From Swiss-Prot:
Coiled-coil region(s): none
Tissues where this protein is expressed: Expressed in intestine.
Top-level taxon of the source organism: Eukaryota
GO BP term, example: signal transduction
Disulfide bonds: none
Signal peptide region: 1-19
Gene Ontology MF annotations: lysozyme activity
Gene encoding the protein: lys-2
Keywords: Antimicrobial, Immunity, Innate immunity, Signal
Phenotype of null mutants: Reduced survival following bacterium B.thuringiensis (B-18247) infection. RNAi-mediated knockdown causes a reduction in survival following bacterium P.aeruginosa infection.
Protein name in UniProt: Lysozyme-like protein 2
Domain Ch-type lysozyme stretches: 47-265
Lineage: Eukaryota, Metazoa, Ecdysozoa, Nematoda, Chromadorea
């Protein structure tokens, strides 16, 4: 009886939590098996399929994702733990994805209440990748979960712009992962964001396949500084290739060709990530 009550309580918490606030490491009970990447039904050859995740995984899983018709993986490179830190798990994930011939994008979950400024957190990500032989061409900044941000829209906008400005100094393209609600709560729906920033928005009804929305941009509505979208996250907390992921659709950019054969990292080859998403 106690176990039944505990299970019911966990399910209630998962069903009532906002999806991006669920820690996927703790959400196995809500996982559902997803099919392979959906066929793009709008006859638009400039659209592609992707997944995003933060777990460490291996090249076999990356090969499986490739066979399941996903073209790009979004991998976390910065965690908000403490003052914020480089996510060392991304190094192996990037190398494995590169070996599998997948396109790679990197996102950061910054720590807005850190003693470090936004630009300093971006430096940690940039240097962490560069020191591991990985060149970064674009970065995505996660701006979600308003409870984790100060109740100060002006300070939050300044923090975000600090990251963007530093990234642009490095010559990186920049995108923001958010949605209309999160952006409004965190920034007061500010449009005072540095120019040429892409949008990756999320719209789901809940975790698992039953919470999916359509893998198109048809539901996008302009907000803040964002007049169009580059990526949509339409599914969260699903299992693909025995890995808990979120699923996305994106506008295709013009990247360098991905390798067709497994990479021998002992050769010292420089991996380049980013640039797979168009604006």
């Amino acid at each position: 009886m106690i176990k039944l009550l505990v299970s019911f309580t966990i399910l209630f918490v998962l069903s009532s939590a906002r999806p991006q606030e669920i820690d996927s490491n703790q959400a196995a009970i809500a996982n559902t098996e997803a099919n392979e990447a959906p066929v793009i039904v709008n006859n638009d050859a400039s659209m592609g399929n992707a997944v995003d995740f933060s777990f460490p995984t291996n090249v076999q899983v990356m090969n499986c994702l490739k066979k399941a018709k996903y073209q790009v993986v979004f991998l976390r490179g910065f965690v908000p733990t403490g003052n914020g830190a480089f996510d060392s798990n991304c190094v192996g994930n990037i190398r494995n994805a590169y070996s599998a011939g997948l396109g790679i994008e990197t996102y950061m979950t910054p720590q807005p209440i850190s003693s470090w400024q936004g630009y300093q957190q971006l430096d940690l990500l940039y240097n962490g990748l560069n020191n591991n032989g990985i060149t970064i061409r674009s970065v995505w900044i996660q701006v979600t979960s308003p409870a984790n941000w100060p109740n100060n829209p002006t300070a939050n906008v300044n923090f975000i712009n600090s990251i963007i400005s530093r990234a642009q100094q490095y010559g990186l393209s920049v995108g923001i992962y958010t949605n209309q609600y999160d952006w409004s709560q965190i920034t007061g729906n500010s449009a005072n964001i540095n120019s040429n920033v892409m949008l990756w928005y999320w719209n789901v009804l809940g975790g698992g396949t039953s919470g999916e929305t359509k893998p198109t941009f048809a539901d996008f509505r302009a907000f803040g500084p964002f007049k169009k979208a580059s990526v949509k996250q339409y599914a969260q907390v699903e299992t693909v290739c025995n890995l808990v992921v979120n699923r996305d659709v994106y506008a295709v950019g013009i990247p360098a060709a991905a390798p067709k054969t497994e990479v021998n990292m002992a050769d010292g080859e420089k991996i380049v990530v980013g640039g797979f998403v168009g604006n």
